Swiss-Prot record:
It comes from the Eukaryota. Keywords: Aspartyl protease, ATP-binding, Cytoplasm, DNA integration, DNA recombination, DNA-binding, DNA-directed DNA polymerase, Endonuclease, Hydrolase, Magnesium, Metal-binding, Multifunctional enzyme, Nuclease, Nucleotide-binding, Nucleotidyltransferase, Nucleus, Protease, RNA-binding, RNA-directed DNA polymerase, Transferase, Transposable element, Transposition, Viral release from host cell, Virion maturation, Zinc, Zinc-finger. Disulfide bonds: none annotated. Mg(2+) 2 binds at D1361, D1442, D1443. The active site is at D457 (for protease activity). Pfam families: Pol_BBD, rve, RVT_2, TYA. This is Transposon Ty2-F Gag-Pol polyprotein. PROSITE patterns: INTEGRASE. The gene is TY2B-F. It comes from Saccharomyces cerevisiae (strain ATCC 204508 / S288c). Residues 656-831 form the Integrase catalytic domain. It catalyses: DNA(n) + a 2'-deoxyribonucleoside 5'-triphosphate = DNA(n+1) + diphosphate; Endonucleolytic cleavage to 5'-phosphomonoester. Residues 1151-1165 have a biased composition (Basic and acidic residues).
Amino acid sequence: MESQQLHQNPHSLHGSAYASVTSKEVPSNQDPLAVSASNLPEFDRDSTKVNSQQETTPGTSAVPENHHHVSPQPASVPPPQNGQYQQHGMMTPNKAMASNWAHYQQPSMMTCSHYQTSPAYYQPDPHYPLPQYIPPLSTSSPDPIDSQNQHSEVPQAETKVRNNVLPPHTLTSEENFSTWVKFYIRFLKNSNLGDIIPNDQGEIKSQMTYEEHAYIYNTFQAFAPFHLLPTWVKQILEINYADILTVLCKSVSKMQTNNQELKDWIALANLEYDGSTSADTFEITVSTIIQRLKENNINVSDRLACQLILKGLSGDFKYLRNQYRTKTNMKLSQLFAEIQLIYDENKIMNLNKPSQYKQHSEYKNVSRTSPNTTNTKVTTRNYHRTNSSKPRAAKAHNIATSSKFSRVNNDHINESTVSSQYLSDDNELSLGQQQKESKPTHTIDSNDELPDHLLIDSGASQTLVRSAHYLHHATPNSEINIVDAQKQDIPINAIGNLHFNFQNGTKTSIKALHTPNIAYDLLSLSELANQNITACFTRNTLERSDGTVLAPIVKHGDFYWLSKKYLIPSHISKLTINNVNKSKSVNKYPYPLIHRMLGHANFRSIQKSLKKNAVTYLKESDIEWSNASTYQCPDCLIGKSTKHRHVKGSRLKYQESYEPFQYLHTDIFGPVHHLPKSAPSYFISFTDEKTRFQWVYPLHDRREESILNVFTSILAFIKNQFNARVLVIQMDRGSEYTNKTLHKFFTNRGITACYTTTADSRAHGVAERLNRTLLNDCRTLLHCSGLPNHLWFSAVEFSTIIRNSLVSPKNDKSARQHAGLAGLDITTILPFGQPVIVNNHNPDSKIHPRGIPGYALHPSRNSYGYIIYLPSLKKTVDTTNYVILQDKQSKLDQFNYDTLTFDDDLNRLTAHNQSFIEQNETEQSYDQNTESDHDYQSEIEINSDPLVNDFSSQSINPLQLDKEPVQKVRAPKEVDADISEYNILPSTIRSRTPHIINKESTEMGGTVESDTTSPRHSSTFTARNQNRPGSTNEMIDLTSQDRVNYGLENIKTTRLGGTEEPYIQRNSDTNIKYRTTNSTPSIDDRSSNSESTTPIISIETKAVCDNTPSIDTDPPEYRSSDHATPNIMPDKSSKNVTADSILDDLPLPDLTHKSPTDTSDVSKDIPHIHSRQTNSSLGGMDDSNVLTTTKSKKRSLEDNETEIEVSRDTWNNKNMRSLEPPRSKKRINLIAAIKGVKSIKPVRTTLRYDEAITYNKDNKEKDRYVEAYHKEISQLLKMNTWDTNKYYDRNDIDPKKVINSMFIFNKKRDGTHKARFVARGDIQHPDTYDSDMQSNTVHHYALMTSLSIALDNDYYITQLDISSAYLYADIKEELYIRPPPHLGLNDKLLRLRKSLYGLKQSGANWYETIKSYLINCCDMQEVRGWSCVFKNSQVTICLFVDDMILFSKDLNANKKIITTLKKQYDTKIINLGESDNEIQYDILGLEIKYQRSKYMKLGMEKSLTEKLPKLNVPLNPKGKKLRAPGQPGHYIDQDELEIDEDEYKEKVHEMQKLIGLASYVGYKFRFDLLYYINTLAQHILFPSRQVLDMTYELIQFMWDTRDKQLIWHKNKPTKPDNKLVAISDASYGNQPYYKSQIGNIFLLNGKVIGGKSTKASLTCTSTTEAEIHAVSEAIPLLNNLSHLVQELNKKPIIKGLLTDSRSTISIIKSTNEEKFRNRFFGTKAMRLRDEVSGNNLYVYYIETKKNIADVMTKPLPIKTFKLLTNKWIH
């Protein structure tokens, strides 16, 4: 019955070409994403009808008909079973999958559905389902892979398939599988399934539908019995029985491998090489083929490989055939070397062929007669033959030889010959090295040339060869000029000999010339006749005069040829010859020097200026022009770099013609920022239209008065100097030109003001191009000279002088010549920035040096002198008394300039001017100098500070002209997380200068610190003081009684880490150690050269710098013992606020109360004399190599925030020298690395589709993910995420508007499984979103504050979740996404309507949407300054994306908000919070236990228990629990880390995971770990074994204390006020590069709500500065929190700040307006005073032992760590 139905309705079932058909359902094996049509939602069911071509019938599938695929016809009689295929995968008639939301990848179980095909597939047999036509296996058939391209693709509009498609034969044996699979692939391609078949690279053109997959699976099963499959195929199918595509892909790969061997042999046999590609590329290609054959066990011998290569050589490489023809032991490497040699030689010659010679096609008909010395015939040759003329051999030129000395009248030939023959070195020249390429034009077909032969030319007087391969004894050409019959010059590179070895052993040699500029190699019969050799053209031989035959000659075409096999090769790879013309160029000036002297002008301008005599005392012939046109000045490349060339003719074409100086162009440039006030910030330029003469004037501002003064000056100058009147001035429409003042000025003088018109960008081209040129020159000159930027206008001035003196490419004269002025006298010009010595006419004393180092800038406008910059005086002077400094190492030398030394050349050029200066200096005494030299008047006076204070100057020390020896210091390797990505690591090692305690200062509790200077200045002062009375090299004695008198007895000192040091006795008993150190020691204080004794002070306590205002030694609070914690900050409203009220209820450790007079307390208040040189660590940060302890660390000189100034008198009084080590640079590539440190990559917790569903072996979990998948799809369609009414073609949409998408899956903390369809925002184009929009979420401090207030006020806490929150927000931009895979619309796009998750703008759109709804519909208001915190009179809401936390005293108020939200959003109540018992929440990762009116506990035990074991960190390896996250005294070794790159990346990734999780936990509630997390985060990119161990130790401590919680208790109801307190602390200089660690803890009503630990952004120079920095970081956040608390709770608030630094409190308290030494920290201190007094903030002192913020700044011993944390986290 069933069979009859099949025959009656052949279209009812499809794809049944398999062994048997069963209708028995196996539910466990259905596809997890398959749903029945009856259960399909209405909107989904409609979506499947898109583009449907026909309606379905009860007998067909609900899937639309696909006219591009076919399948076998069903069969009434099932074929035999084909083996072990799983029969539950067979297609059943009643299992048509309608919805088919399946990914194109293979499901684990195959369910078949109907597949619409054409009845014309093939003629089915009623007794057997498969065609009877089975071609025998022995029948040869074309390779289906090779014939695939023969089948054209079926057009999209085609609705019928090919008729009579032959199915593949059935597999008969395992050995025939490779043959069978070819027919099977061809069968699929003929069935129009080629797009889903993988190619040899494993790629597919289109995604496979479920029906296509089922069809392939069933046909493969039908034609390939399982027991006949190869083993490797069975292994694939055992893993996934339906993975047929993998089998096909590997089969194609195996076929490609089998075909590769044949392809390699074909490629090797057909090798061709003519030099068009590089020899290296050819060698790599051949070697790759041979190596691939070798891997297939096919060995190709060198002899065979050489023969195959030689067979394919052509062009200049042909001669290798003859050379290797007789060799039996050919080596492949030798052949490659010969090919490389010829290629390099041809490359050099091609690069040096000149292009100025005429082509051969320009030659005329020439009749040439052989010389009388030979018996050769006369030949006539036509060089202009037509296309119909008979092909001829190579041209034979009439070549004549002439000597330079005999052709004195032929100047142009002599000059061209001379200028093209310069040597690249003084001693040798490479043949063809300096010639330019000029490819010869072949007027004769190249096929007429007889390869490897010389053309015998009877008309040539010289033998010419193109290759130097046969040239012996080569020397450069210096005397001979060669011309052809048309008297055109032929450049000759070299002269040598050709050696012949003829048949009978006769050897001879003739003279030959080498030139690449001929068509063929020419053998002169005249040269042969000189050797008694003649040519017999009747017998075609070369013969001696006695008739001996030497060699045969061959007639080819119309000419005779001699084989090159008789030539003896020279066998040299690079011919070098002596420079015979060296004496002619030895006195020439090198072009780089002239280029620098003339302001880095271009080659053409300089050459043209010299030809026009625009520059005097210098001729064009005096300059070495070799490589001048191709010379690349590195400074020009950097300084003149432009985007593109200026458009020619950009100036207005309708400009009228004016006389000189009647039409001016002007423009203003500026401002230039970050300059001293005395330096100009602008300049205004003028250009004359006629002469192009240029003027520049400096400007400090753009005020009307300044501009008017310049115009007055320029007009007066032109009128008096050039007797001309300015008629028109062209300018732009800037306000400086269009103001009324200037307009009136022009009107009164009858000058036309010509302004640019709207949108006319070309009208002002002259002035704009001038400014661009001047700025290019300015940048180049400053970069080349290395001078500071404040001299920028001097560079512009120099450039203007040079530009006025040079001829521009468009003019025949320079601007000076056009203006009637004399040319530039080059003897008056020095290179910009040339080091010079200027005479000092007024030294400090008669024995002081008379010379001051300086740098030449430009000639003076107002005198005959030169403007010199004196860095030591920070002035520019106008003087003629200077001497060029010889062999000065400066910035000029860093590019080497072809290793040229310009001192001698510079002296010769300036000899005339120098003699004038020397003559003046000889005749005049120092007292008779000019007035300008006496006064050193400066146009720009930068600063009036003394020389000794110029620490950042780039100048040369006046008294130390020799280059200082650089002492190399190994810099530590570590990562500074706080360094900006645009900065470089500090490059200076800090000083270790012992600091002297001043008597007067110590009586007030302060110290005087000796300031740090640079090594350069310190050595200068030492040199000065050594010869002065009373100077000494020894340090001052620090053991005197009057130096220390402030109770330094029995003081117990500790290291930064807390380990104890021995007691220090009274001053008389203090041990002062001395050691010998160098004045500039290295980092480990090794001594060298000069020595001095340095005291080592072994006293450590906290230091107070002398930069703070004086603090009373014995303030009134200290005199009374009744105030252990005195109120340091009195206030008018503080009558009821005391220290006890602030400290009350704080979780401080319980300590025995000690009076201030106790020794330990005294030591607490005594300023530290300071610590040791630090390295980097979690602990004391000490460096074991450092043996010196100093009182105070100084910040580096490159930290510009603090400028330490030391006068000369201070140094003379102290008789001290700087001990600062030399600067060293740490060369670590951190620019990209720092970004990684700042943004730690989180651990990926989501799964991809294949991970969650396709290959998920956990069936239960997979089912949950499938359910979540369908739920997400339904939600997307329900929310109208995209426009389903229209599909867009991909080719019609701008690609940047197309957004990629994907599905991600994850398991939430509550155990639910979630699927999310997200956009790939990480690759979203910037034009598709507004970068100014921000996605805001609630700040963690705001959440903690809200929770704390809720606990104190018995609030109800309700937790909500809004499903698919982003989908409620519309998008404004026009964006498109690719449809989900189930739709099968690969070339279509959908218009996006909603803010899909992952888009850049989705977060901001949702924030604006929900904010508007809460304000308008829920009567809420957002708290100012705290985004995502909303409140009204009853409810407070904290919003974090789609999570909402509601706080209210009345639960009904929360319910009312929920009801309002549900009207608009799908709102889910996670926890209503109505129970009076303990309620557990999971809020933003925090596990909270809350019982109203009692307590709140915050922890992450469940999360840490789940996540920590997944980090692959060994937990509890010894079975012991850690009691502290780190111990003091552990130091991170900063030696360079040598590690493999892959291992390095792996360890960095591991560090990112570990520190990322630790940071998440630390900033949530484990504030006690923040110091360790912050320190280790700085070393993420330095994953040494030590750093990893410390990180493991931190993770281990987190595991051991995972059950710890942040405990809060309800505030006492008797206290009506809210109390907000910040506790601050700083650890001075315990971070790398002397940075200080600062920390703050914030408490609300005694509950810790936040903490921060970070490295100070500025380098502090004392403990007080570090404490001030910490307090300044705490107060702004304290004020913001105060505003939030007052908004959320209307109770009065008391704000307090606690610190353990009395000096910081005194500074805040002080009203002294005395100027601080450090302006940066002085500014901070003054701001603190204003904030404290203006915000009613109470500042109190807290003992260090009670300061819980101490855990944020340093590692502590276990006992101390527990003592400070056990009150608030346990």
